């Protein structure tokens, strides 16, 4: 994990850090060469000109990935923001297989 992102996460509760790292690991499982860095103080994961952002809050994480909208019908148990970000709250399971698909599609299109 990027040291800059690690430092940024220190301001959040352990539960959010744990959730963040679980989601982040799914990004790295795409097996593409990820460049992780903070962009506008937001953890961002780049491959070529594609990006995924994980935005932590006190009780959830917003995921910004361009392919989320393609799978909205499979994400009805989760909230999508008006900007198309997926919100994963602490009390929800991570839809790992679906996120793997979304992340790979986002990064390789």
Residue ranges and their predicted role:
Residues 1-109:
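Charge-dense, helix-prone N-terminal extensions
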């Amino acid at each position: 994990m990027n040291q800059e992102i690690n430092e940024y996460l220190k301001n959040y509760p352990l539960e959010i850090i744990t959730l963040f790292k679980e989601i982040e690991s799914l990004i790295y499982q795409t097996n593409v060469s990820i460049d992780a860095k903070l962009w506008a103080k937001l953890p961002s994961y780049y491959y070529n000109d594609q990006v995924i952002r994980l935005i932590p809050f006190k009780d959830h994480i917003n995921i910004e990935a361009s392919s989320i909208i393609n799978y909205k019908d499979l994400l009805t148990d989760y909230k999508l923001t008006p900007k198309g970000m997926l919100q994963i709250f602490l009390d929800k399971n991570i839809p790992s297989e679906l996120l793997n698909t979304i992340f790979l599609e986002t990064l390789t299109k």
